[in-house]
Amino acid sequence: MALREIIIVPDKQLRLTSKPVETVSPEVRKLADDMFETMYDAPGIGLAAIQIAEPVRLITMDLVRKEGNGKTEPRAFINPEIIGASTETRVYEEGCLSIPEYYAEVERPAQVRIRYTDLDGHVHEEDADGLFATCIQHEIDHLNGTLFIDHISRLKRALVMRKFEKAAKRGYKFVPAKTA
């Protein structure tokens, strides 16, 4: 496993549409391992491969670790897709490792049904709600070149982007804060 650098806005790679994973190879498993290590180190609860400059449809997630009880439940989703969504919506405050130190309320479908392949090559369909639904939608958005700030007002999005563009021009490097 290796720690990888997380790219941040305004990096144009974050706007790429990621390519499907053709086969679950040792290289894909190694990439997932690197993503878990990077996600835990950041710390975060989800990471899309494009966030470490790998434009493939792979997501890692661990929602259990967020609870701070020392337990983990790492999950990898290869070629995930939303195949159904509720009309009911829910608002969660979202953040992103690629947009450090910024959070905003985002409205998304409250429940979604997803299809994905696991690291053993098995295809699954699963219903997601609550934080899981929000997180999987957020990460799938990354695979499609969409950021959570695309779901907020144009004015707020412009202010956020201006902040990061100015910082990038000055050479300032945002580093996610470590938690104790």
UniProtKB/Swiss-Prot annotation:
Instruction: Identify the domain of life.
Output: Bacteria
Question: Which cofactor(s) does the record list?
Answer: Fe(2+)
Q: Which reaction equation describes what this protein catalyses?
A: N-terminal N-formyl-L-methionyl-[peptide] + H2O = N-terminal L-methionyl-[peptide] + formate
What is the active site of this protein? E139
Example of a GO biological process term: translation
Q: How is the cofactor bound?
A: Binds 1 Fe(2+) ion.
Pfam families, per database record? Pep_deformylase
Q: Which residues bind Fe cation?
A: C96, H138, H142
Q: Which HAMAP family match?
A: Pep_deformylase
Family per similarity comment: Belongs to the polypeptide deformylase family.
Protein name, please? Peptide deformylase
Q: What does this protein do?
A: Removes the formyl group from the N-terminal Met of newly synthesized proteins. Requires at least a dipeptide for an efficient rate of reaction. N-terminal L-methionine is a prerequisite for activity but the enzyme has broad specificity at other positions.
Q: What is its EC number?
A: 3.5.1.88
Keyword entries, A-Z: Hydrolase, Iron, Metal-binding, Protein biosynthesis
Does the entry feature the keyword Membrane, yes or no?
Answer: no
What is the organism of origin for this protein? Rhodopseudomonas palustris (strain BisA53)
Q: Name one GO molecular function term.
A: metal ion binding
